[in-house]
């Protein structure tokens, strides 16, 4: 099986990057403009040469937009968000960073409100 690539200024093979590298920083997000997973918004901005285009969470509800950097399980936003309430990957149970919800607006159109 071919492993899905995660782009960015990564510092390990679990999607952590120079910008976000705490133990729970193990997701990457697909960008509509290039259809690639990047470790973070900053990595995309620094490494791509095209304007950012975000997926719309209403129109693209069935598209895999999030990938777990640990097991490479791809998720729709709804699947990620449902399990994110537990802050874990639904496949490998790796913990996710709860602070990611504060940045949904950087990655998606029509994001849910960030709740503390």
UniProtKB/Swiss-Prot annotation:
Oligomeric and partner information: Interacts with the small Tim proteins TIM8, TIM9, TIM10, TIM12, and TIM13.
Binding site for Zn(2+) 2: 68, 71, 89, 92
Stated name of the protein: Helper of Tim protein 13
InterPro entries the record matches: Mito_Tim_assembly_helper, UCP017292, Znf_CHY, Znf_CHY_sf
Residue positions binding Zn(2+) 1: 17, 19, 40, 43
Taxonomy, superkingdom: Eukaryota
Subcellular location: Mitochondrion intermembrane space; Mitochondrion membrane
GO biological process: protein import into mitochondrial intermembrane space
Pfam family, one: zf-CHY
Keywords: Membrane, Metal-binding, Mitochondrion, Protein transport, Translocation, Transport, Zinc, Zinc-finger
Zinc finger (CHY-type): 10-94
Topological relation to the membrane, as annotated: Peripheral membrane protein
GO molecular function ontology, one term from the record: zinc ion binding
């Amino acid at each position: 099986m071919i492993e899905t690539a995660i782009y960015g200024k990564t510092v390990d093979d679990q999607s952590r990057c120079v910008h976000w590298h705490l133990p729970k920083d193990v997701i990457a997000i697909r960008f509509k403009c290039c259809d690639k997973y990047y470790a973070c918004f900053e990595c995309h901005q620094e490494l791509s040469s095209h304007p950012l285009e975000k997926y719309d969470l209403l129109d693209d509800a069935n598209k895999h937009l999030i990938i777990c950097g640990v097991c490479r399980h791809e998720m729709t936003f709804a699947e990620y968000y449902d399990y994110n309430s537990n802050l874990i990957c639904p496949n490998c149970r790796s913990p996710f960073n709860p602070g990611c919800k504060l940045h949904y607006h950087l990655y998606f159109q029509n994001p849910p409100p960030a709740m503390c």
